[in-house]
Amino acid sequence: MSKEETLYSVKVDQERVPLFDEDFYKGFRSELSVRFTMAALDPRAKSNDAVTVNVITRLEHPEEDGEESDEELFQEEKFTLCTLKKGSVYQQPIDIIFSPGEEVFFERVGGDIPVYLSGTCIITNIPEEEDSSDLENDFLYGADEFSSDEEEMDDISVTSSEEEEEENGARIEELNSDEEDAEQAEEEILEKPVPKDEVAEKHSKDKLKKEEKEKKTAVDVSDSVNGKKRKTEPAGEGEQTEKKSKSTKTYPKQVLEGNVTVQDKVKGDGPAAKRKKRVSMRYIGRLTNGKVFDKNITGKPFTFNLGLEEVIKGWDVGIVGMQVGGERTIHIPAAMAYGSKRLPGIPANSDLVFDVKLLAVN
């Protein structure tokens, strides 16, 4: 794991200023930490009144039993960062770090003077192997952590076809092995001599088995007439098989505006995402080399108004038409993403790939 730092500053000139401006990261939350080391007044300001900068943090507080509720609870905390005054205290050294996941705002109180907070943006680079492991554990199996139909997600289909074939092959071999063991055990039992005092009991059991076999044969014959073959399954196994068959169905790729390409992995059955609707999403963002640069797979879903340029153009185009419960892969050309702008973890002129799932439409 490596780290790199870039210069970063915030101008506090309103009552409530966010840590990250929307234009800085276009609605996507990044795995970034920010450390501020200096607060300074604008020397051109005319006001001589003292000005105070407060910090407001908004942290998520899950319920005591560890499960998330339908409406997640949040609590705001406020504290004073510094107080400056023109003519006496133009700047003040500070040392404060905001970690990834914190929702932070700055509040200006007092004089009508802009205050500049400066420092560094700390970027943590996670090795691909470690990131891939986290992705498999959280993204594929994170569904058990959510209970709400609107805000919780099933596991997203990101397993490759080769892995599915290997898994299916392993299961087939295991089933064949179990059947061979059962047949061998049955042959061994038949070969063992039966004591005379057990002959009557065995005869009774054999008679019951014969009757059961005749009943089963009758059922199989009845099903064969309708072109079906019944198979005894444990409770719930049929539903799981149907769900897996649905998730592995292949849908055609579609080329949309700006050469944005989408391919559905799972078709949803809920309300459809339309322009000007507010949607809640889970997602994993990758570069074309497979490296993950951003993701939202746990906690509060990523929510925005579709088609109103609150996110990159590729999302406004690629999400339209999805239904709640649906999963989709979106390939976005650089021109429909961040273009020539370089962002933490995203080189300039990068094509992006997103695996997304639609949780809710409001």
From Swiss-Prot:
Skewed-composition ranges (Basic and acidic residues): 190-218
The UniProt record lists the keyword Protein biosynthesis: no
PROSITE patterns, alphabetized: FKBP_PPIASE (PS50059)
Ranges of compositional bias, category Acidic residues: 146-167, 175-189
A Pfam family assignment: FKBP_C
GO molecular function: peptidyl-prolyl cis-trans isomerase activity
GO biological process: chromatin remodeling
Region entry Disordered, spans: 144-274
Job description of the protein: PPIases accelerate the folding of proteins. It catalyzes the cis-trans isomerization of proline imidic peptide bonds in oligopeptides.
Protein name stated in the entry: Probable peptidyl-prolyl cis-trans isomerase C27F1.06c
Organism taxonomic ancestry: Eukaryota, Fungi, Dikarya, Ascomycota, Taphrinomycotina
